[in-house]
Amino acid sequence: HFRVRVMETGSMEGIVPAPLPLDILYEDEDILVLNKPADMPVHPSIGNYTNTLANAAAFYFQQKNELCPFRCINRLDRDTSGALILAKNALSAAILSAQMRNREIRRTYLAVVCGVTPPSGTVSAPIGRVSDSVIQRQVDPEHGESAVTHYERLAVRNDHSLLEIHLETGRTHQIRVHMGYIGHPLPADYLYHPVYD
C-alpha cells in the first residue's frame, strides 16, 4: 500500500485571520466540515471584512500552521445555518467539486414556511437574477438556470409548515425563491417576504 499526501503551498491571501468561534463537525487531512451559524457570512464582502467564516477558518489554519486556501465546496446564504465543507488541498477540492457537480453529495435542509403546504412536492422552475438587482433572484423561465427543489412536510403549527427540503441544484437563494414561487415564502425573509407578523 502507498499513501500519497498532497501538500499545499498557498494560503488564504486577502482573508484576514480573525479569532471567531468555529463549530467543527469533522476534520481529517483533506477536509474540514463546519457547522455555520445563521447570520454569519461565508466570504468577506463590503461591510463584512473580518466577521466571516473565511476569517475564522484562516485563523484556525494559522493556529495549526497549515497552509490552506479557502475552498468552500458548498454554499450557504448568510442567514442559513448548516454544514459547510472546506477542501484543505487541491486534490480534495477537485474530487468534492466533481461530486457536487454530479449530485453525489446530498443537500438537505429544514425550513419553516408560511401556510400549509401539500404533504410533499417538487418545484422545477429556472432561477435568474432580478434585472436591476445584484442580490435578488426570481423564477425566470426565459433566462434562468435550471433549479429543482423537493420538499416533504414534517409538521404544521400556527399556519406554518416545517419542511425537509432536498436540493437537486444549488442556485443562489433557491429555497427562498422556490418556496415564495409556490405561495409559501419563508416568514420574515427580509428580501423575498418582508412581512413581520
Where in the sequence are the language-model features?
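Short, conserved beta-turn/loop elements at beta-strand boundaries and strand-helix junctions
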Residues: 62, 118-119, 132, 155-160, ...
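RNA pseudouridine synthases
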Residues: 1-133
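Long C-terminal interaction/binding lobes of large macromolecular proteins
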Residues: 151
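Short proline/glycine- and basic residue-enriched helix-capping loop/turn segments at helix->loop/beta transitions
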Residues: 146-148
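Thr-Gly-centered strand-to-loop micro-motif
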Residues: 43-44, 87, 137-138, 163, ...
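Residue-level recognition of beta-strand microenvironments
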Residues: 27, 116, 154-156, 189
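Pseudouridine synthase
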Residues: 49-57, 158-197
